[in-house]
UniProtKB/Swiss-Prot annotation:
A single cellular component GO annotation: cytosol
InterPro entries from the UniProt entry: Fmt, Formyl_trans_C, Formyl_transf_N, Formyl_transf_N_sf, Formyl_transferase-like_C_sf, Met-tRNA-FMT_C, Met-tRNA-FMT_N
Name recorded for this polypeptide: Methionyl-tRNA formyltransferase
Organism expressing this protein natively: Prochlorococcus marinus (strain NATL1A)
Name of the gene: fmt
Reaction equations catalysed: L-methionyl-tRNA(fMet) + (6R)-10-formyltetrahydrofolate = N-formyl-L-methionyl-tRNA(fMet) + (6S)-5,6,7,8-tetrahydrofolate + H(+)
Record function comment: Attaches a formyl group to the free amino group of methionyl-tRNA(fMet). The formyl group appears to play a dual role in the initiator identity of N-formylmethionyl-tRNA by promoting its recognition by IF2 and preventing the misappropriation of this tRNA by the elongation apparatus.
Family: Belongs to the Fmt family.
Amino acid sequence: MKIVFWGTPKYAAENLRTIVKAGYEVIAVVTQPDRKRGRGKKLSPSPVKEAAEELSIPVYATHSISKDQKTKELLLNLKADVYLVVAFGQILPKEILDQPNLGCWNSHASLLPAWRGAAPIQWSIINADTKTGICIMSMEEGLDTGPVIEQESTIIKDSDNLEILTNRLSRMSSKLLLKSLEKIKLTKGLNKSSRLKKLNAIDQTNLKGSPSYARQITKEDNLIDWNQDAKKIIKKIQGLYPNAYTFYNAKRIKILEAIISSDNNQSKESQDIKNQSKTNRIPGEIIMINKQIGIKLMTNDYPILIKYAQLEGKKATDSYTLSIQSNLSINDKLGS
């Protein structure tokens, strides 16, 4: 069974390595072109391209597969049996979807039909979902709308950030792809309809939940609004890790880890803090700096405790060290 693998980020690269290690024949990889990354804006290959080169697999890079007639023809000539797509970053046109005789299959990091689109892991955390997962689906022209042949779920822990959850889902995806390939190879000679029937594919209209859209994350999304409630801010910091940021004295500060302050219970003291915030405290205002605990500041409701952060031009550090680097004091306001 000859496979063409489509993917771009580290998440997908781990899937590629797993498939090759399992003994499957990956005859080519399609990925996004090299892009400028890091502080020096050095032109760098995608993690999938790096993995493919390590594995001596031919690589095709394309800005737009829909417009790239040359790559389309090269792929057609490969006569692959299966296309596997994992976080490729482009929508595949029908003429590509129709090429492999055993179909095009996508591993998507959500419990479909929830969070169709480019950033399902980010939005599941930002939205404070308690559960997410992996779906293996047959690809069609719609955005992540195809019938599902495999699904596995995982609990989103309170401590999960984007990196932690992405790594867990990548391992789940690798496992489900291997399970799916074992079944797909048994459908040789069947047309698409018969193949899906043999694989017990489930139409998404018969799955739990309502459709939702996980749009691409923008730079503007990463800016923290301290006027929001504490829980919403925490979930944004976790879901956009390590990119959620604020400003102080026109310098960018990335907030890497924060928690709702542990004294935010139903005690009279806690309620007094909340009540004071309505009258005396401004969202974003620092109300405590402590060497052991860090920086505590107000939100729209309860205070949060910043544990780790990164001032632009500096390395990531604990928030007390950040307060020294930034010359922060009690009553100063972040976001300005």
